[in-house]
Design a protein with these regions (language model features):
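Long, C-terminal-biased catalytic regions of enzyme "large/alpha" subunits
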Residues: 1-279
């Protein structure tokens, strides 16, 4: 058994379709993070937010900005470097036509751990919104700079990013910002004016994928933008037909128990209880 049921809001997706002159959106990729047209694909990559924790609980915004720029350039390069499937030329044609990339995040919950912010709280919602706005702003800014150097995506005329008939609108936060978390300000007017002058390299720039496997490889506890799945659990892996069971325990949770003064036996007992009953 694999996968869970989900709900797709088709009308909402088409209202945000960056290339409505090419097609109406009908479906997503298998994981559901990116709506795609016929034969389209999207080159994905995710920034590990857990790496931007500072000792004082703050966020290393400057390093996050630099890495967002680098990742955006990298993903645009991937569009060119992909081998695609030679027997299906439409795959390459569709990819180069809109040059979709999907820069996302993982480890948001990890970053909240270190910042002392509770996931799901009003502070947590604002913190997540500020993080993603920052990433999106600098991904779009970099894509515009790439358009200057390499040219905009070929299907830009008639798209929402058409410099002559720009219909794209800057995002409006549904959450009132109360804190700034020492985050540098972003000016969306700069993005609007720059698109009018230079266009943009990629029809899509950001998307948040589930990152289940790559988060595990990277040592993240929070997949994508999700809260931590569980503080302790057993992961089932298909090992050549047999069920390989891997026991997982949250390093952050274990550290908190250590800091609280619990010995190894007490920690083991708590992990076993959490594994069986949840937390």
């Amino acid at each position: 058994h694999n996968g869970e049921p989900g709900v797709l809001f088709l009308d909402a997706a088409n209202r945000s379709n960056p290339v409505p002159h090419l097609y109406a959106l009908e479906a997503t990729n298998p994981c559901g993070e990116q709506w795609l047209g016929p034969y389209e694909n999207c080159c994905l990559g995710s920034i590990n937010l857990a790496q931007y924790c500072q000792d004082d609980g703050g966020v290393n915004w400057e390093q996050l900005r630099k890495d967002t720029v680098l990742a955006t350039i990298f993903l645009d390069n991937v569009v060119e470097a992909n081998a695609y499937v030679p027997a299906v030329p439409q795959l390459r044609e569709s990819a180069l036509r809109a040059r979709r990339i999907g820069l996302g995040i993982m480890g948001l919950a990890d970053l909240m751990y270190h910042a002392g912010i509770r996931y799901g709280s009003s502070d947590g919602q604002e913190f997540g919104a500020q993080i993603m706005e920052f990433v999106r702003f600098h991904a779009m800014k970099t894509s515009i700079e790439l358009a200057q150097a390499r040219g905009p995506f070929p299907a830009i005329k008639g798209s929402i990013y058409d410099p002559q008939h720009l219909t794209w609108k800057p995002p409006i936060s549904i959450i009132e910002y109360v804190n700034n978390y020492d985050r540098p300000a972003v000016d969306w007017t700069e993005i609007t004016e720059s698109i009018k002058m230079h266009g943009i390299r990629n029809a899509a720039q950001t998307t948040v994928a589930p990152t289940g496997t790559i988060s595990t490889v990277a040592g993240c506890e929070g997949y994508g933008c999700e809260p931590v799945f569980a503080l302790a659990y057993i992961r089932h892996v298909n090992d050549q037909g047999s069920d390989l069971q891997l026991t997982y325990a949250s390093p952050a949770f274990e550290k908190a128990l250590r800091d609280y003064g619990m010995n190894s036996d007490q920690r083991e007992k708590i992990f076993e209880q959490v594994m069986n009953e949840g937390s």
